[in-house]
């Protein structure tokens, strides 16, 4: 006798109009410059509403980087930094979301910048689930973490006259994101 079970896979699509992705890096080691990626996509696949089973895909368009300074943005896009012509996207593939408590998670995955992929751990705060006025279920998350830009070949290393670094190597990354639920039923024999 053959049995058929129905697994409910849920896809969540990132809502870019209610999300932002940004970073902070030390400048001259005395102040912080903030930048953001204005164009990005993302999705999450879960087993129902259980985010501990999440598989996450995210990509940011490097050409959309903005620090509110056109000259600096152009420099960030060139070969000294992100090399947008050869590496147009920054990619994150999350493969493990470890629940710490009801609101806190540790997210593990692979971050690819300039063609270099490294494992990273990010901190995630679950903001909750809610229904919007149009009948959609939404999930909100705050994501934060730190990476070393040298690990990804983003190693522009100008030094000041006094021997100090022009830019810090540690980059703090942040995302405030909303995902919209889209259910897909999959039949497994």
Q: Residues of each region from the PLM?
A:
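Low-complexity, acidic/polar, glycine-enriched regions of mature
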Residues: 1-189
